[in-house]
Design a protein with these regions (language model features):
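Residue-level detector of structural "landmarks"
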Residues: 32-42, 64
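Short alpha-helix boundary/capping segments
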Residues: 40-53, 89, 94, 525
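Active-site loops and adjacent core secondary-structure elements that bind or stabilize anionic groups
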Residues: 136-349, 364-382
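C-terminal binding/interaction regions
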Residues: 271, 287-306, 310-313, 321, ...
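Short, positively charged and aromatic/hydrophobic N-terminal segments
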Residues: 20, 24, 28, 81-83, ...
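Intrinsic low-complexity, disordered N-terminal segments enriched in polar/charged/small residues
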Residues: 15-17, 25, 51, 66, ...
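Glycine- and Gly-Pro-enriched alpha-helical subdomains that act as flexible
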Residues: 223-261, 392-491
Length: 542
């Protein structure tokens, strides 16, 4: 039986990748077992039989006994999966598996290649209604998903973090409706982790600053976060938006994406406000997995639906949704329960300033808010450098605090070096695309610059060979960076963090405090005239 299931699964995955619900061998084998259990479900109410009965039995009773030649009336992306279930039922109930497979296999080929493209809603409305009544969200076709009209209490995913984790879904434990609509695409497990974390981040940024906010997420940590402050001509150029009209929301995303373009490649985007045409236009030309926002204008949605050949993930979230106070997480079969992190990050956290310099101007307080709110949704340990309304360097998920400070500082240095006149003037060939330019610039400003400047190599990228940036030139340029704000998700245990932060222009710091070496940290701040606030608030996130 497994060989037969594998043959059908391989065919479907090759023929209809990205066009139907992804079918795995495991799916079909499990469904075959479920179907076999159905025959005894009334007598033996096992948990698996009950689950199979609840989801499949009504439709199977309707379909069983009818010749396959009439089954095409039920064919959609949704009901194709039902047909596969019926095929699994046949396998489970016949001893002539090979014969039956040769009967059904051509049928699947015919209906998917010939019948399916020609059907309209009127052909399968009765079947869809039955399936809708069973809340079979897993079988919802992409077309219906695109309308955002379905009531969803659960959403079945292709797989979990990895393809071998085949059983995966999102759902509400209290049987409530999910606070989202899938307007386009089919987001995956990690997409949703990014979406829900990043949405909280931008929502809080908007509440804290009163400005439109955006975040660029990768692997459940932000690569960038920002609010919608105007851009200088230099920033417009290095963010590749100097040819676009920019609204405050579009500017916020330009900043979030531009902070660390190497890490933001293939990001998931969060927007605090309704996505407008200008922001959608910017999104459409970047390599990105999806976006979450409280709404989309008609023009914006039309633009986004054309991205990635129509598969771009577009999620609309209810801006008024408030989760329960207690959250749970399962690990190794053990459930963890805790109160949600409802800590409010406001300027009141900056009142305790133990350093000699106690001056925190308005711009610094704003940037410190951005840094701390960003850290609240960054995998710990984490440190964030911020300037001019945006994160410019985020160090995430490091076991060592000083390594975190170095990582984030190096990213801030790269952000600043990209604004060096010599980098701005790099003579790229017109054919070199943005991702390749980003990669080339990243190497050019590193110590490995000869990887793109060697003879026979530079000709691939440039119209003429650029002069390298020397180590001294880079050091001198970085020394011109100033007014940077730094946040940490916990206390700094040693003054070495301050030493490293100072080299990247840090003038203002907000950290929890509470280290037994706080005096050493304060002394190092005073050495460089840095103003530091003890917030008394730890922001670990796991």
């Amino acid at each position: 039986m497994r060989a037969l299931c594998n043959e059908l699964a391989v065919y479907l995955s090759k023929a209809f990748y990205r066009h139907i619900f992804p079918v795995t061998v495991c799916d079909i084998v499990i469904l075959a077992i479920d179907a076999a259990e159905m025959t005894s479900a009334e007598k033996h109410r096992s948990a698996s039989a009950t689950a199979a009965d609840a989801r499949l039995l009504p439709f199977v009773k309707h379909r069983l006994g009818k010749p396959y030649r009439t089954a095409h009336l039920a064919v959609t992306e949704r009901s194709l999966y039902i047909i596969i279930r019926l095929f699994a039922h046949d396998i489970a109930h016949t001893r002539t598996e090979r014969t039956r497979f040769h009967i059904i296999s051509p049928f699947v080929i015919i209906v998917t290649q010939i019948v399916l493209p020609r059907l309209t809603k009127k052909h399968f409305a009765p079947y869809n209604e039955r399936i809708d009544n069973r809340n079979m969200t897993r079988d919802m076709p992409l077309g219906d998903l695109g309308k955002g009209e379905e009531v969803m209490k659960e959403f079945m995913l292709k797989y979990g973090c990895n393809p071998n984790q085949s059983t995966s879904k999102i759902y509400m434990k209290n049987d409530a409706e999910l606070p989202i609509k899938i307007l386009n695409g089919r987001p995956g497990y990690i997409n949703f982790l990014d979406a829900f974390n990043s949405w909280q981040l931008v929502k809080e940024l908007k509440e804290a600053t009163g400005l439109p906010a955006a975040a660029s997420f990768k692997h459940v940590s932000p690569a960038g976060a920002a609010v919608g402050l105007p851009l200088s001509d230099t920033l417009k150029k290095i963010y590749y938006v100097d040819d676009l009209e920019l609204t405050p929301l579009a500017t916020a995303y330009a900043r979030a994406r531009g902070a660390d373009r190497m890490s933001s490649y293939g990001d998931f985007v969060a927007l605090s406000d309704v996505c407008d045409k200008e922001t959608a236009t910017m999104l459409a030309r970047e390599v990105s997995d999806g976006v979450i926002a409280p709404g989309y204008t008609d023009e914006a949605l039309a633009i986004l639906k054309t991205k990635r050949k129509g598969t771009y993930n577009v999620i609309e979230i209810d801006p008024n949704y408030v989760p329960e106070e207690v959250e749970e997480k399962d690990l190794f079969g053990i459930t963890f329960s805790q109160s949600r992190n409802n800590a409010q990050i406001t300027e009141a956290l900056f009142e305790n300033r133990p350093t000699a310099n106690k001056d925190l101007p308005e711009e610094a307080r704003r940037d410190l808010l951005i840094a701390l709110i960003t850290l609240k949704y960054t995998q710990s340990n984490s440190v964030c450098y911020a300037k001019d309304g945006q994160a410019i360097g985020i160090g995430a998920g490091q076991q060592s605090r000083v390594h975190c400070t170095r990582l984030a500082g190096n990213k801030a240095d790269i952000w600043w070096l990209r604004q060096h006149p010599q980098v701005l003037a790099l003579p790229f060939k017109d054919s070199i695309r943005r991702p390749d330019r980003d990669n080339t610039i990243d190497v050019y400003i590193s110590d490995d610059y000869m990887d793109v400047l060697a003879e026979g190599v530079w000709q691939q990228f440039f119209t003429e060979k650029p002069e390298p940036l020397t180590r001294e030139e880079k050091k001198h340029w970085i020394q011109t960076l100033s007014g940077v704000s730094l946040g940490s998700d916990a206390f700094f245990p040693f003054g070495d963090n301050i030493e490293r932060a100072h080299r990247s222009g840090v003038t203002y710091i907000a950290q929890a405090g509470g280290s037994i070496r706080d005096d050493n940290v304060i002394e190092t701040c005073d050495k460089y005239g840095i103003a530091m606030a003890f917030t008394g608030l730890r922001l670990f996130h796991h």
